[in-house]
């Protein structure tokens, strides 16, 4: 398979999985290994991730624009910005302190497959269990107006996503539900929180890999970026409706199946 087709396929995988609770990082790492896709190195997944992030901005641009223009005069806008920043803070601290450990240990070829398989399997089981014990009547149903304490607690849940295979969206949506936030509101807040979180992670990774930017295969990167953006647009637009109807259980079963399949693959390799 040539690089263009590989870039398209990886862009599709990134766009599909970035905002679903199944871990885009796990799927990209596994797909890259199976496809033998190594060029242009670590720069490719970092940049195409930005395409998926921009899909959120494209879908919710009116919300972000209204907040921006009314920020000086609107208490609601200031509250919204503060909740997102408060939830973002734990990931900033964890990312800056643990970036080297995350990349060198958790993402090492020797450790990553086992971490991913374990995270997928345990995460799937946890989803199925917690979906049964979550509060029957949510206390908070507005993703734009969460209390600061709840936003911070959701941000702490997001830190778990430093482990490949955990899923940032899965951790925040499930954590939000357990904190009394309705499923649609938790998913909406997850989308909002994704913008600074993933943008910050992307900027940090690009800076750390700045030497690799020279001579990178920008055609492959551009194709993956655009593909991830377009696919993520569809996912972002339909995800909350799907979640409201079916819940997280389908993703829990998928994660269990994927984790078991990966364990089998590791054993046979």
Where are these regions (language model features)?
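Multi-pass membrane proteins that catalyze or facilitate reactions on polyprenyl-/lipid-phosphate substrates
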Residues: 1-269
């Amino acid at each position: 398979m040539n690089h263009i087709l590989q870039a398209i396929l990886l862009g599709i995988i990134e766009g599909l999985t970035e905002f679903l609770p199944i871990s885009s990082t796990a799927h990209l790492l596994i797909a890259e290994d199976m496809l033998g896709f190594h060029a242009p190195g670590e720069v490719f997944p970092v940049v195409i991730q930005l395409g998926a992030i921009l899909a959120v901005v494209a879908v919710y641009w009116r919300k972000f624009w209204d907040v921006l223009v009314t920020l000086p005069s609107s208490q609601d806008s200031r509250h919204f910005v503060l909740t997102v920043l408060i939830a973002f803070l734990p990931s900033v601290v964890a990312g800056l302190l643990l970036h080297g450990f995350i990349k060198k240990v958790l993402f090492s070829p020797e450790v990553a497959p086992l971490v991913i398989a374990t995270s997928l399997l345990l995460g799937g089981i946890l989803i199925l269990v917690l979906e049964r014990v979550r509060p029957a009547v949510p206390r908070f149903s507005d993703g734009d107006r969460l209390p600061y304490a709840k936003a911070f607690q959701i941000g702490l849940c997001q830190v778990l996503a430093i482990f490949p295979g955990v899923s940032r969206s899965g951790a925040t949506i499930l954590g939000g539900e357990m904190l009394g936030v309705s499923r649609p509101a938790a998913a909406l807040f997850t989308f909002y929180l994704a913008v600074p979180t993933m943008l910050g992670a992307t900027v940090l990774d690009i800076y750390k890999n700045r030497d690799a930017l020279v001579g990178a295969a920008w055609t492959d990167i551009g194709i993956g970026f655009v593909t991830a953006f377009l696919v993520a647009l569809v996912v972002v637009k339909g995800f909350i409706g799907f979640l409201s109807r079916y819940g997280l259980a389908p993703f829990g079963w998928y994660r269990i199946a994927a984790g078991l399949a990966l364990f089998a693959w590791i054993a046979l390799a």
